């Protein structure tokens, strides 16, 4: 499974390099919309700069005469992409961990132990059949403390999705209401309140905005921090290998 590459533009909070300290060629690239984050020393005595453009990490390299800058990847003699490593280490991985903290702080429907080997956040729609299948598949893992699941309900698949989501969240025991709904294949409907509390409406809207910010275009959208502390993403029903990785938190 590939490491999830998050939309980083909203998460880069550290100060960026001041334009006045940049060589003229790098300043010209900055004027084209590349945000320069920090300098770094590249192999071979080459000066490099780390940046981002529209949420994607980029590396720039200054020629020895200081008159030209090259945007792209640097490889070593063994074919290793050295640029990709610094982009991952300095941008994607820290941004992923920052996003994971946000996901952990969000209210949701929790199932399983806080001591489980792998903590999982899943965005789900009440009318999503793949979400239901995933919920059923992970129940044994939840029961044996391999996983804990926090479900963030969204309302995107049907006009009544939001109504069902808010009714489940408004229940006296949202976790039980969700479990009953999923276990019954959606036949055990939640009790619908006369009106949706504003806080629940805002929560569902926030869930949807967060899912979109993460780049997910469908449900279930599954996230977890693996044993290497890398944020992982699965969109849709996990295949056999993805389920094995999830169960092992790798």
Each predicted region: which residue ranges?
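A short beta-strand-turn-helix
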Residues: 100-118
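C-terminal low-complexity, charged extensions that often adopt amphipathic alpha-helices
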Residues: 93-98, 142
């Amino acid at each position: 499974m590939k490491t999830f590459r998050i939309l980083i533009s909203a998460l880069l909070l550290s100060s960026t390099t001041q334009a006045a300290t940049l060589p003229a060629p790098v300043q010209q690239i900055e004027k084209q919309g590349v945000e320069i984050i920090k300098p770094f020393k590249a192999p071979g005595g080459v000066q490099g700069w780390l940046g981002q453009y529209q949420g994607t990490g980029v590396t720039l390299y200054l020629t020895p005469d200081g008159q030209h800058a090259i945007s792209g990847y640097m490889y070593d003699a063994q074919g290793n992409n050295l640029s990709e490593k610094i982009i991952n280490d300095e941008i994607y991985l820290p941004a992923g961990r920052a996003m994971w903290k946000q996901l952990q702080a969000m209210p949701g429907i929790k199932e399983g132990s806080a001591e489980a080997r792998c903590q999982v956040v899943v965005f789900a729609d009440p009318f999503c059949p793949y979400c239901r299948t995933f919920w059923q598949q992970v129940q044994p893992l939840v029961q044996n403390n391999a996983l804990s699941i926090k479900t963030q309900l969204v309302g995107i698949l049907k006009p009544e999705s939001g109504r069902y989501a808010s009714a489940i969240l408004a229940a006296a025991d949202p976790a039980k209401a969700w479990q009953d709904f999923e276990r019954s294949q959606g036949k055990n409907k939640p009790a619908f309140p006369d009106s949706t509390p504003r806080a629940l409406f805002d929560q569902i809207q926030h869930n949807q905005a967060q899912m979109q910010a993460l780049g997910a275009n469908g449900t279930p959208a599954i996230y977890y921090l693996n044993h290497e502390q890398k944020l992982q993403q699965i969109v849709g029903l996990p295949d056999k290998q993805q389920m094995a990785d999830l169960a092992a938190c790798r």
